[in-house]
C-alpha cells in the first residue's frame, strides 16, 4: 500500500466512524422524542398506538381519585375537552386540582392515558409554555 492509499484509508475509516456515530445519535434522539398534545388535540387526532406523548392542561376540579397505594386517577382538561389519566407513583408536591400539569406516557386502548411521569407547575406564576400558549389562544388563561 502506498502512502497515499494509507492516508485515504484512514480518512475513509474516520468518516465512516463519524457517520456511524451521527446515525446512532440521531436514532437515539428519535427514540426519546415525545410529541405535545392538549386534550382537544388528542381527541381530534389520536396518537398512534403505544406512541410516547406529552399531554398538557389543567387538572379538572373534582376529578382526582386516589386508589390503593400510589395509584391515582384524574382528568386533564383544556377548557373544552378532558382526557382521563391513570398514574401509579408519587405525585409532585405541587400537584392539585385546577393547576397546570404536563404528563408523559401512552394512550391506552380504552381511551385512558397511562402516565409514567407527572410534572406540576413550579410556582404561582409558572405555566408550561406549550400549555400557556394553547390556553391563551383558546382564551382560557390570562397571564398575571
Curated annotation (Swiss-Prot):
Q: Please, which domain of life does this record's source organism belong to?
A: Bacteria
Q: Which UniProt keywords apply?
A: Cell inner membrane, Cell membrane, Cytochrome c-type biogenesis, Heme, Iron, Membrane, Metal-binding, Signal-anchor, Transmembrane, Transmembrane helix
Q: Which GO terms describe its cellular component?
A: plasma membrane
Keyword Cell inner membrane included in the entry's annotation: yes
Where along this sequence does the record place binding of heme?
Answer: 122, 126
- List where in the cell it is found: Cell inner membrane
User: InterPro entries of this UniProt entry?
Assistant: CcmE, CcmE-like_sf, NA-bd_OB-fold
Q: How does it sit in the membrane?
A: Single-pass type II membrane protein
Q: Which residues lie on this side of the membrane: Periplasmic?
A: 29-144
| Any one GO molecular function term | metal ion binding
Q: What is its main location?
A: membrane
Stretches of the chain found on the membrane's Cytoplasmic side? 1-7
Q: Which residues cross the membrane?
A: 8-28
Q: Name one Pfam family in it.
A: CcmE
Biological process terms in GO annotation: cytochrome complex assembly
What function is annotated for this protein?
Heme chaperone required for the biogenesis of c-type cytochromes. Transiently binds heme delivered by CcmC and transfers the heme to apo-cytochromes in a process facilitated by CcmF and CcmH.
- Give the family from UniProt: Belongs to the CcmE/CycJ family.
Record-linked HAMAP family: CcmE
- The protein depicted here goes by the name Cytochrome c-type biogenesis protein CcmE
Organism equals Chelativorans sp. (strain BNC1)
Amino acid at each position: 500500500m502506498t502512502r497515499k492509499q494509507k492516508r485515504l484509508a484512514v480518512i475513509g475509516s474516520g468518516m465512516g466512524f463519524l457517520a456511524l456515530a451521527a446515525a446512532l445519535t440521531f436514532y437515539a434522539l428519535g427514540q426519546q422524542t415525545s410529541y405535545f398534545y392538549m386534550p382537544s388535540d388528542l381527541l381530534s387526532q389520536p396518537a398512534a398506538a403505544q406512541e410516547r406523548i406529552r399531554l398538557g392542561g389543567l387538572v379538572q376540579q373534582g376529578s382526582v381519585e386516589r386508589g390503593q397505594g400510589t395509584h391515582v386517577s384524574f382528568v386533564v382538561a383544556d377548557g373544552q375537552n378532558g382526557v382521563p389519566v391513570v398514574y401509579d407513583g408519587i405525585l409532585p408536591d405541587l400537584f392539585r386540582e385546577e393547576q397546570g400539569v404536563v404528563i408523559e406516557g401512552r394512550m391506552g386502548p380504552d381511551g385512558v392515558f397511562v402516565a409514567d411521569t407527572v410534572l406540576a407547575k413550579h410556582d404561582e406564576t409558572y405555566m408550561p409554555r406549550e400549555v400557556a400558549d394553547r390556553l391563551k389562544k383558546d382564551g382560557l388563561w390570562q397571564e398575571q
